[in-house]
């Protein structure tokens, strides 16, 4: 178990043994009650039977709870419920909170590599499988693509194929990295979103990494934009399902839409309705226990970079959906490491500039053309370490 000393693991084993001593008598009592129901004596009436059934269900619930805690304590030493080593899993205890209140405590288990069960349950029984995605491969790295597909768990050698994009990103798109929006300043972030939407005349897809910031930005700018004839819709704010929000956004070139992961990974809005994608910050992975375990098993910071590049590529992919599309991809963060720029298609111009300079670009809809992007060698240490 990560970050647990030997004494802690030993105490966990003692606690598991103590819980087992409580659970075993409950099991025996449950068996006796079940036998009493099956071979009921003459004096057992309907009410008595109902009380015994209730006691059985109550005992079963307590037995299951104790078993779960025993399993957790066993996992602290790196073992599963059968006292066998369990290196393929990550276990943790989490408190669920809503609106500042704690309402549940959960014992969670996930595969260290989710592709292992995927390969067993989906790939192995299939006659043939085709996996395709614009972000399956990280640059020219086929090894990462194979790992993401589950192919290493199969005995067959997969057939590999790649195709170049038909779109001219170098002359149809620009990446603008805005350097003067302070991180954590919601007012400045909202002001930047509002000014960008006004400069573009709508047609903006705003992507957030946190629902709280999305709601805060929407609350500050929606009324002002609406008065200017620029409707603003938002996932997690408007009581409309995501598919309908996207349809409304697609049908109104003056509308803009704010959202989170679902919009970053699955929106198809070609044409004038989507002219600009705005990302509030670099989409770093959340430093959860599960992520830290997978990070440690897959190369540390290189694992994080692969995730971020895939997310950036997905977000950028919302912008150009047909040969006639053009637009800008704006990142409101100066802390954008140059090593992540490979997420964008080769030849796409990339600029670091202030918000005012970015607004001039958006207002004129000017494109600098191939090879015009000049990027300062600015790096940031991954906040996950």
Language model features with spans:
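Conserved C-terminal RecA-like helicase domain
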Residues: 182, 213-215, 219-244, 248-249
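Short hydrophobic/aromatic-enriched beta-strand-loop microsegments
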Residues: 228-232, 275-280, 352-353
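Acidic, Ser/Thr-rich peripheral helices and adjacent loops at domain boundaries
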Residues: 150-152, 294-301, 347-359
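Conserved coupling segment at the C-terminus of the helicase ATP-binding
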Residues: 1-224
């Amino acid at each position: 178990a990560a970050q647990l000393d030997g004494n802690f693991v030993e105490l966990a084993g003692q606690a598991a043994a103590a819980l087992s001593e409580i659970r075993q008598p409950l099991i025996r009592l449950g068996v006796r009650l079940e036998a009493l129901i099956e071979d009921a004596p003459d004096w057992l009436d309907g009410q008595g039977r109902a009380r015994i059934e209730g006691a059985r269900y109550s005992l079963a619930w307590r037995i299951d709870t104790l078993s779960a805690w025993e399993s957790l304590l066993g996992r602290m030493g790196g073992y599963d419920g059968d006292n066998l080593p369990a290196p393929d899993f990550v276990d943790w205890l989490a408190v669920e909170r809503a609106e500042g209140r704690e309402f549940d405590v959960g014992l969670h288990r996930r595969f260290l590599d989710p592709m292992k069960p995927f390969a067993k349950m989906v790939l192995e029984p299939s006659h043939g499988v085709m996996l395709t995605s614009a972000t399956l491969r990280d640059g020219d790295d086929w090894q990462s693509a194979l790992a993401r597909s589950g192919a290493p768990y199969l005995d067959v050698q997969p057939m590999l194929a790649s195709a170049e994009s038909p779109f001219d990103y170098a002359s149809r798109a620009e990446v603008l990295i805005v350097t003067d929006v302070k991180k954590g300043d919601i007012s400045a972030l909202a002001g930047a979103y509002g000014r960008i939407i006004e400069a573009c005349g709508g047609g903006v897809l705003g992507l957030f990494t946190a629902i709280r910031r999305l709601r805060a930005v929407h609350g500050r700018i929606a009324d002002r934009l609406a008065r200017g004839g620029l409707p603003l819709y938002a996932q997690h704010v408007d009581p409309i399902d995501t598919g309908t929000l996207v349809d409304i956004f697609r049908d109104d070139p003056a509308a803009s839409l704010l959202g989170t992961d679902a919009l970053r990974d699955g929106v198809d809005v070609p044409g004038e309705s989507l002219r600009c994608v705005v990302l509030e910050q670099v989409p770093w992975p959340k430093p959860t226990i599960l992520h830290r375990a997978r990070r440690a098993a897959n190369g540390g910071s290189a694992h994080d970079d692969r995730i971020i590049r895939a997310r950036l590529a997905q977000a950028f992919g919302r912008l150009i959906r047909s040969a006639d599309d053009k637009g800008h991809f704006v990142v409101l963060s100066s802390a954008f490491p140059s090593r992540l720029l490979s997420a964008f298609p080769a030849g796409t111009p990339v600029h670091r500039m202030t918000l005012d300079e970015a607004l001039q670009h958006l207002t004129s809809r000017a494109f600098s053309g191939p090879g015009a992007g000049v990027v300062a060698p600015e790096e940031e240490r991954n906040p996950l370490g």
